[in-house]
Curated annotation (Swiss-Prot):
Pathway(s) of this molecule: Aromatic compound metabolism; 4-hydroxyphenylacetate degradation; pyruvate and succinate semialdehyde from 4-hydroxyphenylacetate: step 1/7
Any Pfam family the entry gives: Flavin_Reduct
GO BP annotations listed: benzene-containing compound metabolic process; pyrimidine nucleobase catabolic process
Assembly with partners or alone: Homodimer. 4-HPA 3-monooxygenase consists of a reductase component HpaC and an oxygenase component HpaB.
Biological source species: Salmonella typhi
Protein name as catalogued: 4-hydroxyphenylacetate 3-monooxygenase reductase component
Gene behind the chain: hpaC
SMART domains in alphabetical order: Flavin_Reduct (SM00903)
EC nos: 1.5.1.36
Family note: Belongs to the non-flavoprotein flavin reductase family. HpaC subfamily.
Catalytic activity: a reduced flavin + NAD(+) = an oxidized flavin + NADH + 2 H(+)
InterPro entries: Flavin_Rdtase-like_dom, HPA_mOase_red, NADH-dep_flavin_reductase, Split_barrel_FMN-bd
Amino acid sequence: MQVDEQRLRFRDAMASLAAAVNIVTTAGHAGRCGITATAVCSVTDTPPSVMVCINANSAMNPVFQGNGRLCINVLNHEQELMARHFVGMTGMAMEERFHQPCWQNGPLGQPVLNGALASLEGEISEVQTIGTHLVYLVAIKNIILSQEGHGLIYFKRRFHPVRLEMEAPV
């Protein structure tokens, strides 16, 4: 199998991996930006740590690294349009994305999305280059949880809501 064919088959296989949709944001002396990401996962709960992967060619990497902090906003099913803004599907400029009324600053000064299922603010403790991506290891310092909302996932190159079914009484 040639390298290009294997790369395409790998991408098709990864499209079958349903993943939570997140907007990863940062703000500080290096600037403010955010990106929609599905390559986000927990590493350990002691100490709370998360891994975030961003394409190495992204112009946002110097901003994330320069600020040294970020926030992972786990989107609810009603926030698909915001996900589309931050992936660049709508043509909305970066600063305009943050002028929406749904943003506030968290305790670490990071952009927190109101209504997100969870917002995890943390400090970037390590950055590794692996192939085409930078892998950020983030030490979580502040967690905001929402009691409302259903999930939003990305599966087969499309957004899908994930709704909790009501449990039948036992």
